[in-house]
Each structure stands twice: as C-alpha cells, then as structure tokens.
Amino acid sequence: MGSGTGEKGRKGDEGPAKEITLSPYWMGASEVTYDEYDAFFKDESFTRNQPAPDAITRPSPPYIDLTLGMGKQGGFPANSMSQYGALMYCKWLYKKTGIFYRLPTEAEWEYACRAGTKTAYPFANDTTGLSKYAWYKNNSENKYHKTALKLPNAWGLYDMLGNVAEWTMDQYDESYFSKPEAKDPLIIPTTRHPRTLKGGNYSDDATALRSANRIKSNPDWNRRDPQIPRSRWWNADAPFIGFRIVRPVKKPSEEEINHFFSAYLDNY
C-alpha cells in the first residue's frame, strides 16, 4: 500500500510504499445507503436516550436537512456521517443479526480499492477512464449520486473512488508508513480528530481519488451543530462523508466484539 515517489499528485504522507498482510474479510459492494441507515434510525426497539453501558441508541434527528437536497431514498449514500454514527450502525447490525460488522482499517480499504493493482487508480495510472468509475468534480454537478451507477473495480466494489468519502478505523498519522506493523496494521484512535478517510468525494479533483490518497478528518466539518449538546452522530458541514462496512471472515468472540465497540464508542 502507499504510492511510489513518481506518482502524479502524490503527497508526503503516502509512503514509502510497503507490503502488508491482512486477515481475510468481506467488504460491502456499495457504500451504506440512506435507506439502510434509515432502518436503524427508525428502529423503535432501541431508544434515543443516553445509553447504559453496552446499549444501543438510535441517532437523534438533526434539525437541518443534511442531504442539502441531493437525495435520500432509492439508493443514495448515507451522508454527513460521523465515525461514531457509522460504528453505531455496525453495533446495531450486530445486535440485530449476531454478525459482527465494522468499518475497514485504512489498510483493508486501500487493498480492496486497488483490487490487485499497483497503479494510481484501480484501472490505470492516468485519469482517462475515471468518469466511468467515479463521481467527482468533473462530472458530479457538485452532488453525490445513487450508489452503483458507475463501473465497479475488478473485485466488484462500486464507488470506491468519489461519490462520498469513506471512514476507516484508523487515527490519522502522517508517519503511518514508517510504523513497523506489517500484519493487520491499525492505529487505534486516541483523539476524535484527525482520523483517516479514503476515496475522495464528488467535489474533489482527480488526484484526491487515487488509491493511496489519505484524508484527515477535521472538526470544522461540524461547525454548525445539528444537535444541542454537540452531536456525535452527524457532520453538519460535511455532506460528502459516508461509509461502507466489512465483515471479518473469522468472527471475534463476544468479549472481543464488546471490547471493540466499547473502545471506539464510549469516549467518542
């Protein structure tokens, strides 16, 4: 993962490129949609009150339209998402299905995006065919679009580039590639910002959509609080953020799963 020194648009935090080993996992073919997230939002078997330990709460309704009129039902991606909101959706899925889902690590995301390639984009080193695969600045009309309308990568994953940027599990670290971990690398967050997103979004230029590009989360993404007290669920000023989920092939123990969600959610 990472980019070579000669890659056009390369930034200093993308290398040196290195080989990693990942445990097997499945990844969602598309970004989680508004309809899918709305099922969580409307699930009345869970409360919107302050949770007890280990409990599930539903998102509190924002006071503004976080889609900015770009679209909701019918396959549009869930947007304006915080990492907390994305992980609570994963926790809800686990409680509903007994299957453990989570966000991908930065390494898992990039590996899946590349789909076996070492080029700047999953299809080539240049941007000639980018519009066939991605919604971005040149073709999006400055809005996100329904998922899976563009071509997938070689592994059948849609919208890995553009549309909405996607959360990973990692704390952003400029020196990520100098870390020694080569097996299942993960930088566990210790602060809310910056954390790492990948993929670029509908308003980005082509260089931001490269497989190796890294995005730092920013507290300015929630300057206008959609809730009082400060929302953990939404990023009111970042309609370009969504997520997709993964499922490890080897299911962790219930104790490990509970520890995972507690570590990420309790002090967010």
Predicted regions mapped to residue ranges:
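Signature tryptophan residues that serve as conserved aromatic anchors
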Residues: 92, 109, 135, 155, ...
